[in-house]
Regions:
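Glycine-rich, flexible N-terminal cofactor/catalytic loop recognition
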Residues: 1-57
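Short active-site oxyanion
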Residues: 23-29, 102-105, 152-153
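Conserved helicase motor
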Residues: 53-61, 133-137
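Short amphipathic alpha-helix with an adjacent loop that forms part of the alpha/beta core around
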Residues: 64-72, 145, 205
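Class I SAM-dependent methyltransferase SAM-binding "motif I" and its flanking Rossmann-like core
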Residues: 93-149
């Protein structure tokens, strides 16, 4: 059996009884970082010393078959460094391979940065989408593509890129789009900062430290205004996108007329 198990995202007290039992008895652990797993076993006072198999983004495709074969004969515990395996962490190829081979996969649920950030954000939680890590480049175009997304959106971002990401968010989705920066969740210096995109961009202009989750409100049903749309087109053009292509992209995401956007942006240049 393959067992995906969630580990703490910052507070060791969040370890579940089921995880403790599994760590104390399992013979094999597939770990994102074996050093992190060894530290976890030591911190929890676990005397069991299972076989540790590295399973990370660079080898998970190649290692999946081996681990599935082991899971056919005995329990294999799968751990990421923090949170739930397969959620923006190694695990998906392994689960897919196990399912295809008819090997049972189960879960020991627990901490999740995505759900923790969503729950504490104060933004609607009935419908949401997790978008993973923001791209390093082309974020204005990326955010513009999400301009009409009605669901609350959750992203991961590095602390070093957070100021630029928030500025791009304000440019693409408007300065008044509601958002929440969740920093160091469940840890000693946890911070949840709510505000508009422009307010958060100003607050974090000098950067931030720690693990970051960014939660962004979905689009309201109201149609975007033409001036806002023209502003989005000009922002894309400033990123190197051709005016015609930028107008088409914003028209697709906002429902505004491509011709009106093109002519308005042309006049504003």
């Amino acid at each position: 059996m393959i067992i995906l198990a969630a580990t703490p995202i910052g507070n060791l007290g969040d370890v579940s009884r089921r995880l403790l039992e599994a760590l104390g008895s399992v013979g094999i652990i597939a770990a994102e970082d074996t050093r992190t797993t060894i530290h976890l076993l030591s911190a929890l006072g676990i005397e069991n010393r299972p076989r540790l198999i590295p399973l990370h983004e660079h080898n998970e495709d190649a290692r999946a078959g081996e681990i599935v074969a082991l899971g056919r004969e005995q329990d294999v515990l799968v751990l990421s460094d923090a949170g739930m395996p397969a959620i923006s962490d190694p695990g998906f190829p392994l689960v897919a391979a196990a399912a295809a081979a008819g090997v049972t996969v189960t879960v020991i649920p627990g901490p999740s940065a995505v759900l923790t950030a969503l729950a504490v954000s104060g933004l609607p939680t009935d419908r949401f989408t997790f978008e993973g890590f923001l791209p390093r480049k082309g974020r204005v175009a990326y955010f513009t593509g999400l301009a009409r997304e009605p669901r609350t959106m959750v992203f991961f971002e590095s602390p070093n890129r957070l100021p630029a990401a928030l500025a791009d968010l304000a440019t693409a989705l408007g300065p008044d789009r509601r958002a929440v920066v969740c920093r160091e969740l469940t840890k000693l210096h946890e911070e949840v900062r709510r505000g508009t995109a422009s307010e958060l961009a100003e607050y974090f202009a000098e950067g931030a430290r720690g693990e970051i989750c960014l939660v962004v409100a979905g689009a309201t049903p109201a149609t975007a205004s033409l001036p806002d749309g023209i502003g989005q087109v000009l922002a894309l053009v400033a990123q190197g996108v051709r005016l015609k292509e930028a107008s088409a992209e914003v028209a697709e995401s906002t429902g505004l007329s491509r011709r009106d956007l093109y002519e308005g942006a042309l006049a504003a240049r």
